[in-house]
Curated annotation (Swiss-Prot):
UniProt cross-references to InterPro entries, sorted A to Z: 6-PGluconate_DH-like_C_sf (IPR008927), KARI (IPR013023), KARI_C (IPR000506), KARI_N (IPR013116), KARI_prok (IPR014359), NAD(P)-bd_dom_sf (IPR036291)
One BP annotation, GO: L-valine biosynthetic process
KARI N-terminal Rossmann domain location: 2-182
Organism encoding this protein: Kineococcus radiotolerans (strain ATCC BAA-149 / DSM 14245 / SRS30216)
Positions annotated as active site in the UniProt record: 108
UniProt function note: Involved in the biosynthesis of branched-chain amino acids (BCAA). Catalyzes an alkyl-migration followed by a ketol-acid reduction of (S)-2-acetolactate (S2AL) to yield (R)-2,3-dihydroxy-isovalerate. In the isomerase reaction, S2AL is rearranged via a Mg-dependent methyl migration to produce 3-hydroxy-3-methyl-2-ketobutyrate (HMKB). In the reductase reaction, this 2-ketoacid undergoes a metal-dependent reduction by NADPH to yield (R)-2,3-dihydroxy-isovalerate.
One MF term in the entry's GO annotations: NADP binding
UniProt name for this protein: Ketol-acid reductoisomerase (NADP(+))
Binding site for NADP(+): 25-28, 48, 51, 53, 83-86, 134
Family under the similarity heading: Belongs to the ketol-acid reductoisomerase family.
Length: 342
């Protein structure tokens, strides 16, 4: 069983006596900065000149500096910008100011695990990663609850890295729900695998392929959309609330029987072997290398794949059908988790 941490395991004074720089003010950045401040931590936000987020942070009463200035002023530096931008930010703003005894924090271990960022030996390297989107992290904090976090220490130069990690997790409300001890390697590899094989890649491919099978068999695209994509939320919500068992308990006997007899025909042993291949590419660095090389070249392959995916017939069908659904929010103007390449 995983080792767990709760509020009583952390001393908030470990971090309230330090200045924390939160670099980035997107979904996680705003949640971390505001909750740290409300927990009594001295917070500054690091954003580039001209960033659209500067005004948002200042409106919340936060002090905004450039990433370089924020990193220089801080004892603790939390990096909350997209993975492929962290290397450049580190070289330009963090590394020149990463003096002995400081702490470098992440919410995902990608750049440490794959060696794109190599901090000096005399600083702490820590991860505090809420297992939920930023708006939920902030809402739960305000409501006196919290979103579970995972916590890791890659480098404990000061002997206080774990105490600081737990204090930070407590300050954003995470230990109200519970913190799980992990490592940078475990977090990074499992996170990437989940995204690629199940949550994003696996689910997207399954939905698209199901839609194709039905429409190629002569069924109407609108009906195929409902059966293969729209109703997925109903099933996932049941899993979210009570696991696969609750989903099976809640659906009809017909659906449950189909689950047992047909699910393994689609996701069979050969699929499991290919999932293992995906994991191997993550573990040996192949995925990270291909991703970073493409990003460094201006993301040509990434943009090509995105454009191709957006042309899939399921997208046009969905756009029309969602016009019938008054309860579905279609405006994405305030969506801040998305790609920096858009």
């Amino acid at each position: 069983m995983a080792e767990m941490f709760y509020d009583d395991d952390a001393d908030l004074s470990t971090i309230t006596g330090k200045k924390v720089a939160v670099l980035g003010f997107g979904s996680q950045g705003h949640a971390h900065a505001l909750s740290l401040r409300d927990s009594g931590v001295d917070v500054v936000v690091g954003l580039k000149e001209g960033s659209k987020s500067r005004a948002k942070a200042e409106e919340q009463g936060l002090t905004v500096l450039t990433p370089f200035e924020a990193s220089k002023a801080a004892d603790v530096i939390m990096v909350l910008v997209p993975d492929h931008l962290q290397r450049g930010l580190y070289a330009e703003a963090i590394e020149p100011n990463l003096t002995a005894g400081k702490a470098l924090f992440f919410s995902h271990g990608f750049n440490i695990r794959f060696g794109y960022i190599k901090p000096p030996a005399d600083v702490d390297v820590v991860m505090v990663a809420p297992k939920g989107p930023g708006h939920l992290v902030r809402r739960e904090y305000v409501d006196g609850r919290g979103v579970p976090v995972i916590v890791a220490v890659e480098q404990d130069a000061t002997g206080q890295a774990w105490a600081l990690a737990l204090a930070y997790a407590k300050a954003i409300g995470g230990l109200r729900a519970g913190g799980i001890k992990t490592t940078f390697t475990e977090e990074t590899e499992t996170d990437l695998f989940g995204e690629q094989a199940v949550l994003c890649g696996g689910a997207s491919a399954l939905v698209q392929t199901g839609f194709e099978v039905l429409t190629e068999a002569g069924y109407q695209p609108e009906v195929a959309y409902f059966e293969c994509l729209h109703e997925l939320k109903l099933i996932v919500d049941l899993m979210y609330e009570g696991g696969i068992a609750k989903q099976r308990w809640s659906v009809s006997d017909t659906a449950e029987w189909g689950d047992y007899v047909s699910g393994p025909r689609v996701i069979d042993a050969s699929v499991k072997e290919r999932m293992k291949d995906v994991l191997k590419d993550i573990q040996d660095g192949t995925f990270a290398r291909n991703f970073i090389e493409d990003q460094d070249a201006g993301a040509p392959k990434f943009k090509e794949l995105r454009a191709k995916a957006e042309q899939h017939p399921i997208e046009a069908t969905g756009r029309e059908l969602r016009k019938l659904m008054a309860w579905v929010k279609s405006d994405d103007s305030d969506y801040v988790e998305g790609s920096a390449a858009r």
